[in-house]
Protein backbone atom coordinates (compact mmCIF):
# COMPACT_ATOMS: atom_id res chain seq x y z
CA UNK A 1 0.00 0.00 0.00
CA UNK A 2 1.13 3.52 -0.82
CA UNK A 3 -0.39 6.63 0.75
CA UNK A 4 -0.31 9.95 -1.09
CA UNK A 5 -1.35 13.22 0.54
CA UNK A 6 -2.45 15.79 -2.04
CA UNK A 7 -3.97 18.69 -0.19
CA UNK A 8 -4.83 20.10 3.23
CA UNK A 9 -7.51 22.59 4.18
CA UNK A 10 -6.96 23.44 7.82
CA UNK A 11 -6.46 20.06 9.49
CA UNK A 12 -8.53 18.21 6.86
CA UNK A 13 -6.60 16.05 4.38
CA UNK A 14 -7.22 14.94 0.79
CA UNK A 15 -5.25 11.95 -0.43
CA UNK A 16 -5.39 8.40 -1.71
CA UNK A 17 -4.46 4.84 -0.78
CA UNK A 18 -2.94 2.89 -3.65
CA UNK A 19 -3.29 -0.89 -3.71
CA UNK A 20 -2.75 -3.54 -6.37
CA UNK A 21 -6.51 -4.00 -6.39
CA UNK A 22 -7.28 -0.32 -6.89
CA UNK A 23 -7.10 3.23 -5.59
CA UNK A 24 -9.08 4.50 -2.61
CA UNK A 25 -9.65 8.25 -2.53
CA UNK A 26 -9.56 9.75 0.96
CA UNK A 27 -11.35 10.78 3.10
CA UNK A 28 -13.06 7.42 2.58
CA UNK A 29 -15.99 5.57 4.10
CA UNK A 30 -15.88 1.76 4.15
CA UNK A 31 -19.18 -0.15 4.14
CA UNK A 32 -19.15 -3.06 6.58
CA UNK A 33 -19.44 -6.60 5.24
CA UNK A 34 -19.31 -8.50 8.51
CA UNK A 35 -19.80 -12.01 7.14
CA UNK A 36 -18.35 -11.34 3.70
CA UNK A 37 -21.48 -9.53 2.53
CA UNK A 38 -22.71 -5.96 2.83
CA UNK A 39 -26.21 -6.82 4.04
CA UNK A 40 -28.81 -6.79 1.28
CA UNK A 41 -26.37 -5.69 -1.44
CA UNK A 42 -24.66 -7.35 -4.38
CA UNK A 43 -20.93 -6.46 -4.62
CA UNK A 44 -21.58 -4.60 -7.88
CA UNK A 45 -24.27 -2.53 -6.17
CA UNK A 46 -21.88 -1.62 -3.36
CA UNK A 47 -19.33 -0.47 -5.93
CA UNK A 48 -22.02 1.50 -7.77
CA UNK A 49 -22.65 3.58 -4.63
CA UNK A 50 -19.07 4.84 -4.98
CA UNK A 51 -17.48 2.61 -2.34
CA UNK A 52 -13.89 1.70 -3.23
CA UNK A 53 -13.01 -0.41 -0.17
CA UNK A 54 -15.05 -2.47 2.27
CA UNK A 55 -14.51 -3.97 5.72
CA UNK A 56 -14.65 -7.65 6.67
CA UNK A 57 -14.82 -9.09 10.17
CA UNK A 58 -11.98 -11.40 11.18
CA UNK A 59 -13.73 -12.71 14.29
CA UNK A 60 -16.99 -13.68 12.61
CA UNK A 61 -15.39 -15.06 9.44
CA UNK A 62 -12.99 -17.20 11.46
CA UNK A 63 -16.00 -18.82 13.18
CA UNK A 64 -18.32 -18.99 10.17
CA UNK A 65 -17.48 -20.30 7.62
CA UNK A 66 -13.87 -20.62 8.83
CA UNK A 67 -10.70 -19.87 6.88
CA UNK A 68 -10.44 -23.36 5.34
CA UNK A 69 -13.44 -22.92 3.06
CA UNK A 70 -12.49 -19.32 2.21
CA UNK A 71 -8.96 -20.42 1.24
CA UNK A 72 -10.45 -23.05 -1.08
CA UNK A 73 -11.94 -20.15 -3.06
CA UNK A 74 -8.62 -18.26 -3.06
CA UNK A 75 -9.21 -15.53 -0.49
CA UNK A 76 -12.02 -13.35 0.85
CA UNK A 77 -12.13 -11.28 -2.36
CA UNK A 78 -12.79 -14.43 -4.39
CA UNK A 79 -15.20 -15.85 -1.81
CA UNK A 80 -17.48 -12.80 -1.88
CA UNK A 81 -16.66 -11.61 -5.42
CA UNK A 82 -15.46 -8.15 -4.36
CA UNK A 83 -12.91 -6.74 -6.80
CA UNK A 84 -11.55 -3.89 -4.70
CA UNK A 85 -9.44 -3.69 -1.53
CA UNK A 86 -10.65 -5.10 1.80
CA UNK A 87 -9.73 -4.04 5.33
CA UNK A 88 -10.25 -6.64 8.04
CA UNK A 89 -10.49 -5.79 11.71
CA UNK A 90 -8.52 -7.98 14.08
CA UNK A 91 -11.43 -9.39 16.08
CA UNK A 92 -10.45 -7.51 19.22
CA UNK A 93 -13.62 -5.42 19.42
CA UNK A 94 -15.89 -8.43 18.90
CA UNK A 95 -14.07 -10.37 21.62
CA UNK A 96 -14.44 -7.32 23.89
CA UNK A 97 -18.18 -7.35 23.15
CA UNK A 98 -18.56 -10.94 24.42
CA UNK A 99 -18.41 -9.73 28.04
CA UNK A 100 -18.49 -12.63 30.49
CA UNK A 101 -18.01 -15.13 27.66
CA UNK A 102 -14.31 -14.21 27.43
CA UNK A 103 -11.17 -14.16 29.60
CA UNK A 104 -8.25 -11.88 28.77
CA UNK A 105 -4.68 -12.95 29.58
CA UNK A 106 -1.23 -11.75 28.54
CA UNK A 107 -1.22 -14.36 25.78
CA UNK A 108 -4.58 -13.42 24.30
CA UNK A 109 -8.27 -14.05 24.81
CA UNK A 110 -10.03 -17.29 25.72
CA UNK A 111 -13.70 -17.23 24.80
CA UNK A 112 -16.70 -19.34 23.96
CA UNK A 113 -17.78 -19.68 20.36
CA UNK A 114 -21.04 -17.68 20.29
CA UNK A 115 -22.45 -20.14 17.73
CA UNK A 116 -21.84 -23.53 19.38
CA UNK A 117 -20.24 -22.77 22.75
CA UNK A 118 -16.89 -24.43 21.97
CA UNK A 119 -13.70 -23.03 23.52
CA UNK A 120 -11.59 -20.77 21.29
CA UNK A 121 -8.34 -18.89 21.84
CA UNK A 122 -7.30 -15.84 19.86
CA UNK A 123 -4.12 -13.83 20.32
CA UNK A 124 -2.05 -11.58 18.05
CA UNK A 125 -0.51 -14.52 16.20
CA UNK A 126 -3.86 -16.20 15.57
CA UNK A 127 -5.44 -12.94 14.38
CA UNK A 128 -2.57 -12.26 11.96
CA UNK A 129 -2.81 -15.83 10.65
CA UNK A 130 -6.53 -15.52 9.97
CA UNK A 131 -6.13 -12.15 8.24
CA UNK A 132 -3.29 -13.50 6.09
CA UNK A 133 -5.55 -16.37 4.97
CA UNK A 134 -8.35 -13.90 4.22
CA UNK A 135 -6.00 -12.03 1.88
CA UNK A 136 -6.79 -8.67 3.49
CA UNK A 137 -5.31 -5.57 1.86
CA UNK A 138 -5.24 -3.81 5.23
CA UNK A 139 -4.66 -5.91 8.34
CA UNK A 140 -5.43 -4.52 11.80
CA UNK A 141 -3.32 -5.43 14.83
CA UNK A 142 -4.92 -7.44 17.62
CA UNK A 143 -5.76 -5.11 20.51
CA UNK A 144 -7.95 -4.83 23.56
CA UNK A 145 -10.76 -2.33 23.26
CA UNK A 146 -10.65 -0.30 26.48
CA UNK A 147 -14.07 -0.30 28.17
CA UNK A 148 -15.99 2.93 28.78
CA UNK A 149 -15.98 4.36 31.30
CA UNK A 150 -12.57 3.30 32.63
CA UNK A 151 -10.35 4.66 35.37
CA UNK A 152 -6.90 5.92 34.43
CA UNK A 153 -5.29 2.77 35.85
CA UNK A 154 -7.62 0.43 33.96
CA UNK A 155 -7.15 2.38 30.71
CA UNK A 156 -3.37 2.40 31.20
CA UNK A 157 -3.15 -1.35 31.79
CA UNK A 158 -5.37 -2.02 28.78
CA UNK A 159 -3.40 0.31 26.50
CA UNK A 160 -0.04 -1.19 27.52
CA UNK A 161 -1.35 -4.70 26.93
CA UNK A 162 -2.42 -3.56 23.47
CA UNK A 163 1.09 -2.18 22.86
CA UNK A 164 2.63 -5.53 23.73
CA UNK A 165 0.13 -7.22 21.44
CA UNK A 166 0.99 -4.66 18.74
CA UNK A 167 4.64 -5.75 18.87
CA UNK A 168 3.61 -9.40 18.59
CA UNK A 169 1.21 -8.57 15.74
CA UNK A 170 4.04 -6.88 13.82
CA UNK A 171 6.31 -9.88 14.31
CA UNK A 172 3.59 -12.35 13.32
CA UNK A 173 2.68 -10.25 10.26
CA UNK A 174 6.20 -10.93 9.03
CA UNK A 175 6.66 -10.71 5.26
CA UNK A 176 2.94 -10.44 4.51
CA UNK A 177 2.75 -7.79 1.74
CA UNK A 178 -0.55 -6.45 3.09
CA UNK A 179 -0.53 -3.13 4.96
CA UNK A 180 -0.56 -3.40 8.77
CA UNK A 181 -2.25 -0.70 10.86
CA UNK A 182 -1.63 0.03 14.53
CA UNK A 183 -4.51 1.01 16.82
CA UNK A 184 -4.20 3.88 19.30
CA UNK A 185 -5.84 3.15 22.66
CA UNK A 186 -5.80 4.87 26.05
CA UNK A 187 -9.41 5.63 26.86
CA UNK A 188 -10.29 9.30 27.24
CA UNK A 189 -6.92 10.22 28.76
CA UNK A 190 -4.55 12.51 26.87
CA UNK A 191 -1.34 11.20 28.44
CA UNK A 192 -2.28 7.59 27.68
CA UNK A 193 -3.21 8.37 24.07
CA UNK A 194 0.18 10.04 23.60
CA UNK A 195 1.97 7.10 25.20
CA UNK A 196 0.10 4.74 22.88
CA UNK A 197 1.02 6.74 19.77
CA UNK A 198 4.70 6.86 20.75
CA UNK A 199 4.76 3.12 21.41
CA UNK A 200 3.09 2.34 18.10
CA UNK A 201 5.27 4.68 16.04
CA UNK A 202 8.38 3.19 17.66
CA UNK A 203 7.20 -0.22 16.39
CA UNK A 204 6.28 1.25 13.01
CA UNK A 205 3.09 0.65 11.03
CA UNK A 206 1.70 1.48 7.58
CA UNK A 207 -1.21 3.41 9.06
CA UNK A 208 -2.71 4.28 12.43
CA UNK A 209 -6.25 3.83 13.68
CA UNK A 210 -7.94 5.47 16.63
CA UNK A 211 -9.75 2.81 18.64
CA UNK A 212 -11.83 2.92 21.78
CA UNK A 213 -14.14 5.70 20.58
CA UNK A 214 -17.85 5.53 19.75
CA UNK A 215 -18.22 3.05 22.62
CA UNK A 216 -20.89 4.97 24.54
CA UNK A 217 -19.13 8.22 25.40
CA UNK A 218 -20.83 11.60 24.78
CA UNK A 219 -20.04 13.19 21.42
CA UNK A 220 -18.22 16.07 23.12
CA UNK A 221 -15.89 13.62 24.84
CA UNK A 222 -15.30 11.71 21.61
CA UNK A 223 -14.33 14.87 19.72
CA UNK A 224 -12.30 16.15 22.65
CA UNK A 225 -10.31 12.92 22.69
CA UNK A 226 -9.80 13.19 18.95
CA UNK A 227 -8.61 16.79 19.37
CA UNK A 228 -5.77 15.82 21.70
CA UNK A 229 -4.93 12.59 19.87
CA UNK A 230 -4.75 13.53 16.18
CA UNK A 231 -1.99 16.19 16.44
CA UNK A 232 0.46 13.54 17.69
CA UNK A 233 -0.24 11.04 14.90
CA UNK A 234 2.23 10.70 11.99
CA UNK A 235 1.41 13.15 9.20
CA UNK A 236 2.62 10.87 6.40
CA UNK A 237 0.43 7.89 7.28
CA UNK A 238 -3.32 7.35 6.88
CA UNK A 239 -5.50 7.89 9.97
CA UNK A 240 -8.52 5.65 10.52
CA UNK A 241 -11.27 6.35 13.05
CA UNK A 242 -12.82 2.97 13.81
CA UNK A 243 -16.58 2.49 14.08
CA UNK A 244 -17.56 6.08 13.25
CA UNK A 245 -20.23 6.86 12.39
CA UNK A 246 -23.03 9.28 11.89
CA UNK A 247 -22.69 11.78 9.01
CA UNK A 248 -22.08 14.70 11.36
CA UNK A 249 -19.43 12.71 13.26
CA UNK A 250 -17.62 11.97 10.00
CA UNK A 251 -17.72 15.64 8.99
CA UNK A 252 -16.30 16.69 12.36
CA UNK A 253 -13.60 14.01 12.26
CA UNK A 254 -12.57 14.99 8.71
CA UNK A 255 -12.25 18.59 9.95
CA UNK A 256 -9.84 17.16 12.52
CA UNK A 257 -7.60 15.33 10.05
CA UNK A 258 -9.05 11.80 9.83
CA UNK A 259 -8.84 9.92 6.51
CA UNK A 260 -10.83 6.67 6.91
CA UNK A 261 -14.09 5.57 8.49
CA UNK A 262 -16.30 2.50 8.82
CA UNK A 263 -19.64 1.92 10.50
CA UNK A 264 -22.71 -0.31 10.33
CA UNK A 265 -25.00 2.72 10.79
CA UNK A 266 -25.95 3.32 7.13
CA UNK A 267 -26.84 -0.34 6.49
CA UNK A 268 -28.36 -1.15 9.88
CA UNK A 269 -30.41 2.03 9.98
CA UNK A 270 -31.60 1.44 6.42
CA UNK A 271 -33.12 -1.89 7.45
CA UNK A 272 -34.98 -0.05 10.21
CA UNK A 273 -36.36 2.68 7.94
CA UNK A 274 -33.97 5.33 9.25
CA UNK A 275 -32.68 7.14 6.16
CA UNK A 276 -30.10 9.88 5.70
CA UNK A 277 -30.74 12.86 3.43
CA UNK A 278 -29.13 16.23 2.76
CA UNK A 279 -31.73 17.86 5.04
CA UNK A 280 -31.38 15.34 7.85
CA UNK A 281 -32.91 12.02 8.83
CA UNK A 282 -36.14 10.69 7.32
CA UNK A 283 -38.00 8.02 9.29
CA UNK A 284 -39.73 6.37 6.37
CA UNK A 285 -42.23 4.43 8.48
CA UNK A 286 -43.76 7.64 9.85
CA UNK A 287 -47.32 8.26 8.65
CA UNK A 288 -46.39 11.54 6.95
CA UNK A 289 -44.66 9.52 4.21
CA UNK A 290 -47.69 7.33 3.43
CA UNK A 291 -48.99 9.65 0.70
CA UNK A 292 -45.80 11.50 -0.21
CA UNK A 293 -45.03 11.53 -3.93
CA UNK A 294 -41.61 13.10 -3.32
CA UNK A 295 -38.34 11.22 -3.72
CA UNK A 296 -36.49 10.43 -0.55
CA UNK A 297 -33.85 13.09 -1.28
CA UNK A 298 -34.22 15.45 -4.24
CA UNK A 299 -30.45 16.08 -4.26
CA UNK A 300 -29.56 12.38 -4.46
CA UNK A 301 -28.95 10.59 -7.76
CA UNK A 302 -29.06 7.03 -6.39
CA UNK A 303 -31.26 4.34 -7.96
CA UNK A 304 -33.78 4.59 -5.13
CA UNK A 305 -34.25 8.35 -5.32
CA UNK A 306 -34.38 8.37 -9.12
CA UNK A 307 -37.09 5.71 -9.34
CA UNK A 308 -39.26 5.60 -6.21
CA UNK A 309 -41.35 7.85 -3.99
CA UNK A 310 -41.41 8.08 -0.23
CA UNK A 311 -44.90 6.58 -0.34
CA UNK A 312 -43.58 3.44 -2.05
CA UNK A 313 -40.71 3.07 0.42
CA UNK A 314 -43.17 3.58 3.29
CA UNK A 315 -45.42 0.88 1.80
CA UNK A 316 -42.56 -1.62 1.47
CA UNK A 317 -41.46 -0.97 5.03
CA UNK A 318 -44.97 -1.45 6.41
CA UNK A 319 -45.31 -4.73 4.51
CA UNK A 320 -41.91 -5.99 5.62
CA UNK A 321 -40.79 -6.42 2.02
CA UNK A 322 -37.12 -7.31 1.51
CA UNK A 323 -37.07 -4.93 -1.45
CA UNK A 324 -37.69 -2.05 0.94
CA UNK A 325 -34.59 -2.84 2.98
CA UNK A 326 -32.56 -3.15 -0.22
CA UNK A 327 -33.72 0.17 -1.65
CA UNK A 328 -33.13 1.87 1.69
CA UNK A 329 -29.62 0.42 1.90
CA UNK A 330 -28.76 1.48 -1.65
CA UNK A 331 -29.76 5.02 -0.73
CA UNK A 332 -27.99 5.24 2.64
CA UNK A 333 -24.70 3.90 1.27
CA UNK A 334 -24.95 6.21 -1.73
CA UNK A 335 -25.62 9.17 0.57
CA UNK A 336 -22.49 8.37 2.60
CA UNK A 337 -20.37 8.16 -0.55
CA UNK A 338 -21.82 11.46 -1.82
CA UNK A 339 -20.87 13.00 1.51
CA UNK A 340 -17.30 11.70 1.23
CA UNK A 341 -17.02 12.91 -2.36
CA UNK A 342 -18.23 16.35 -1.32
CA UNK A 343 -15.69 16.48 1.50
CA UNK A 344 -12.87 15.43 -0.84
CA UNK A 345 -13.78 18.05 -3.43
CA UNK A 346 -14.12 20.76 -0.80
CA UNK A 347 -10.69 20.01 0.67
CA UNK A 348 -9.12 19.93 -2.81
CA UNK A 349 -10.58 23.35 -3.64
CA UNK A 350 -9.92 24.76 -0.15
CA UNK A 351 -13.64 25.42 0.38
CA UNK A 352 -14.20 23.05 3.30
CA UNK A 353 -15.56 25.77 5.59
CA UNK A 354 -18.25 26.57 3.01
CA UNK A 355 -19.10 22.89 2.55
CA UNK A 356 -19.40 22.35 6.30
CA UNK A 357 -21.54 25.47 6.71
CA UNK A 358 -23.91 24.32 3.95
CA UNK A 359 -24.01 20.78 5.39
CA UNK A 360 -25.27 22.05 8.75
CA UNK A 361 -27.47 24.79 7.27
CA UNK A 362 -29.40 22.20 5.23
CA UNK A 363 -30.06 20.31 8.47
CA UNK A 364 -31.11 23.45 10.32
CA UNK A 365 -28.13 23.24 12.68
CA UNK A 366 -25.26 25.49 13.69
CA UNK A 367 -21.67 24.64 12.79
CA UNK A 368 -19.88 23.25 15.87
CA UNK A 369 -16.73 25.09 16.88
CA UNK A 370 -13.41 23.41 16.22
Curated annotation (Swiss-Prot):
Binding site for substrate: 89-93, 143, 185, 212
Molecular function in Gene Ontology: metal ion binding; tRNA-guanosine(34) queuine transglycosylase activity
Residues that hold Zn(2+) according to the record: 300, 302, 305, 331
GO CC terms of this entry: cytosol
EC number(s) per entry: 2.4.2.29
Stretch list, region RNA binding: 243-249, 267-271
The protein's required cofactors: Zn(2+)
Keywords noted in UniProt: Glycosyltransferase, Metal-binding, Queuosine biosynthesis, Transferase, tRNA processing, Zinc
Pathway: tRNA modification; tRNA-queuosine biosynthesis
NCBIfam families for the chain: Q_tRNA_tgt, tgt_general
Stated name of the protein: Queuine tRNA-ribosyltransferase
Native source species: Hydrogenovibrio crunogenus (strain DSM 25203 / XCL-2)
Amino acid sequence: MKFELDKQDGRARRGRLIFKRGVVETPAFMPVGTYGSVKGMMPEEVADTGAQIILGNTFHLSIRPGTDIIEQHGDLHDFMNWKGPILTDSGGFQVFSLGKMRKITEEGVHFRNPVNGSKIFMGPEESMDVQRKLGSDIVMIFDECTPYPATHDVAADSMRLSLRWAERSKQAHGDNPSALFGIVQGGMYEDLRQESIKGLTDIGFDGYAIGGLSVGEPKEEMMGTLDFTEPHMPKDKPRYMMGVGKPEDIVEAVRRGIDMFDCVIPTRNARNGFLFTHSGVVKIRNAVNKTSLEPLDAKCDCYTCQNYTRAYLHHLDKCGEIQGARLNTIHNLHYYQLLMKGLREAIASETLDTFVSEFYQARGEDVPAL
